[in-house]
Amino acid sequence: MNGDVQSVIRGYLERAQVAKTMSDAGRWNEAGDLLRQLMTDVKSCKISASNRDEHDARNTFLRALEANLKLVQQNVRDEDDLHEAMTRQSGSPEPPADPDVWSKPSPPLPSSSKFGATKKGVGAAGPRPREISKSTSSMSTNPADVKPANPTQGILPQNSAGDSFDASAYDAYIVQAVRGTMATNTENTMSLDDIIGMHDVKQVLHEAVTLPLLVPEFFQGLRSPWKAMVLAGPPGTGKTLIARAIASESSSTFFTVSSTDLSSKWRGDSEKIVRLLFELARFYAPSIIFIDEIDTLGGQRGNSGEHEASRRVKSEFLVQMDGSQNKFDSRRVFVLAATNIPWELDEALRRRFEKRIFIPLPDIDARKKLIEKSMEGTPKSDEINYDDLAARTEGFSGADVVSLCRTAAINVLRRYDTKSLRGGELTAAMESLKAELVRNIDFEAALQAVSPSAGPDTMLKCKEWCDSFGAM
């Protein structure tokens, strides 16, 4: 069996282990969902028609998954039957059948599973429930505890092929949550040329995202493109900007996600959000999933203070990361993440990021270009010495440099007393200030007001981590 198939099967085995853990914990519905999805993925694997070993391995694995799914389904049925029996035992006795005394009871509703399949035998035995008045049913339920309705139609746009995503298996608020993170390639107009510096990062992203779409025949076998990358560095160095730029240049659908986007108060729904995120990324492929502050989502597992819900989300995320790296899946999904504290990442998650790149603070040339670019479109004096400003902003991040330029531009206003002006006088004064030039004195005042936001300790720790675990 070749290495590609072995690698894929290892990923499937990890997902099967997650399903077993869910089943052992009594989370049978979630285990059933994962097993069904896993069986679908295994069946869709494209393997050589002439390789009997690969066919036998896949069939054996499918039989094992099917056996586990039957056990899970039996547990779900047993739990439902027990719940129904307890409900009948604690409910009211069978009403008289005299139609003059009692109204005819309504027929029992079939109990449906999560996927719309009707349970066999449910409602065939036991007393039929009495008709419940509207007033009684409305009093028995707290409206605050009821999930919103499921009107998912029209939330998601069509993909490039004109197809619509079937989101009927998800609650509407879950679909809305993921839709809020998505920007189609027509909504993003940035370019890598807008990003100053970071030449090594641009090169790797160009090789991993743009070129495979232009010349896919080259990126085969060992040259298969990278699927996941994490950018580690101090805050304000342009990690988010470069993610948006590469998504625009490659005409990819862009998902920007934080830990709060993946959170829900409903048990099990956070995992569904993660699953839907990757399903939509594959549906709208080519796609880029950008996860900011990945350390808040993928921190070290096993900590004493870690909540069970957090572990479940991490497990689902790891499973989906492996799913998006299926070598037999031609739908291009690239996972790009950023962090300021990479040493907090879980080891299993760190392994899934094939490229781990250090993003340093901008050097003197990058700072000069950034000051010049920031001042474009703003009236300024020719006396401004950009070389001197670049030299005096050592230790500044890209965001700090932009903040310095904005402060200098605002300082034009502070050179004049506008506190006593009102109405037309204030409007006229502000209109004249639009043409006022930004001068050296404004930058001098800005340098006194703006300090570097990134501490040297953070910079050093990021560099040490990338020296130990980086992969360029």
From Swiss-Prot:
The modification Phosphoserine is found at residue 92. Belongs to the AAA ATPase family. Katanin p60 subunit A1 subfamily. Homohexamer; ATP hydrolysis initiates a cycle between an open spiral and a closed ring conformation which is probably involved in pulling tubulin dimers out from microtubules. Interacts with mei-2, which may serve as a targeting subunit. Interacts with mel-26, which targets mei-1 for ubiquitin mediated proteolysis. Interacts with phosphatase pph-4.1. GO terms for molecular function: ATP binding; ATP hydrolysis activity; identical protein binding; MATH domain binding; microtubule binding; microtubule severing ATPase activity; molecular adaptor activity; protein phosphatase binding. It catalyses: n ATP + n H2O + a microtubule = n ADP + n phosphate + (n+1) alpha/beta tubulin heterodimers. This is Meiotic spindle formation protein mei-1. GO terms for biological process: cell division; embryo development ending in birth or egg hatching; female meiotic nuclear division; meiotic spindle disassembly; meiotic spindle organization; microtubule depolymerization; microtubule severing; negative regulation of meiotic spindle elongation.
